[in-house]
């Protein structure tokens, strides 16, 4: 595997300075949506870069390749899979890592939770190192972050907090972000940051940067948020 060229960054400290206090935009349209096409993903990537986004989170090797050719900001690349015998969805295979690296990802993120998986998380972390890309651990607990740090993973994210249990919370996990930050990790806040105020609170809690997805790039989800709120208000008005 050839080392990839890390777009504009020689080391992790440069990337950390570049992303400090910034918004990373995750562009992952709803599966099957009319917007779930590479051309639209590229268009959104260009638009958010023009608006000031400092990095992107993109799913799929083909999408990463297309977006990488169209933007100048770094890409956090992932591959999502639905496996019949494992709950791991985010970059579960070394082959996914290699594909993302060749497609132009600057950072490769993977599920760092300690669950049944097709290939060990140690193997995935090492595979990312072998490509020359930076690694990001998508974590659900502080223990996941400790493991990632012990493996030399450069970025630790709160991505999976609340998504590995039976009940999904509605608010971000600021406590996990704070714990990661206080441990000295390069912390990426991610998961349910649906307003500018919540994103700002993530930075105040110690995150270097915050990743925002649904609120910016999933029109169906945001439309439902507004519809739910206005319909409830309409029912209340009619009740009076």
Curated annotation (Swiss-Prot):
Keywords: Carbohydrate metabolism, Isomerase
Enzyme Commission code: 5.1.3.9
Gene Ontology MF annotations: N-acylglucosamine-6-phosphate 2-epimerase activity
One Gene Ontology biological process: N-acetylneuraminate catabolic process
CDD domains named among the record's database cross-references: NanE
Assigned protein family: Belongs to the NanE family.
Protein name per its UniProtKB record: Putative N-acetylmannosamine-6-phosphate 2-epimerase
Organism: Vibrio cholerae serotype O1 (strain ATCC 39541 / Classical Ogawa 395 / O395)
């Amino acid at each position: 595997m050839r080392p990839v060229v890390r777009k504009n960054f020689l080391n992790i400290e440069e990337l950390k300075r570049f992303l400090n206090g910034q918004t990373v935009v995750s562009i992952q349209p709803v599966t099957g949506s009319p917007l779930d096409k590479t051309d639209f993903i590229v268009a959104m990537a260009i638009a958010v870069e023009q608006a000031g986004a400092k990095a992107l989170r993109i799913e799929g090797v083909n999408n990463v390749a297309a977006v990488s050719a169209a933007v100048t900001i770094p890409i956090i690349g992932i591959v999502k899979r639905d496996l019949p015998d494992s709950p791991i969805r985010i970059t579960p295979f070394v082959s996914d890592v290699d594909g993302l690296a060749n497609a132009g990802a600057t950072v490769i993120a993977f599920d760092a939770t300690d669950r049944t998986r097709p290939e060990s998380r140690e193997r995935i972390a090492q595979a990312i190192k072998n490509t020359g890309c930076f690694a990001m651990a998508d974590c659900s607990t502080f223990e996941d972050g400790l493991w990632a740090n012990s493996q030399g993973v450069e970025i630790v994210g709160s991505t999976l907090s609340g998504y590995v249990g039976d009940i999904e919370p509605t608010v971000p996990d600021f406590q996990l972000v704070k714990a990661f930050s206080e441990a000295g990790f390069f912390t990426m806040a991610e998961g349910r940051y649906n307003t500018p105020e919540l994103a700002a609170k993530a930075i105040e809690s110690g995150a270097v940067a915050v990743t925002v997805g649904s609120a910016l790039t999933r029109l169906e989800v945001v439309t439902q948020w507004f519809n739910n709120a206005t319909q409830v208000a309409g029912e209340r008005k009619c009740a009076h």
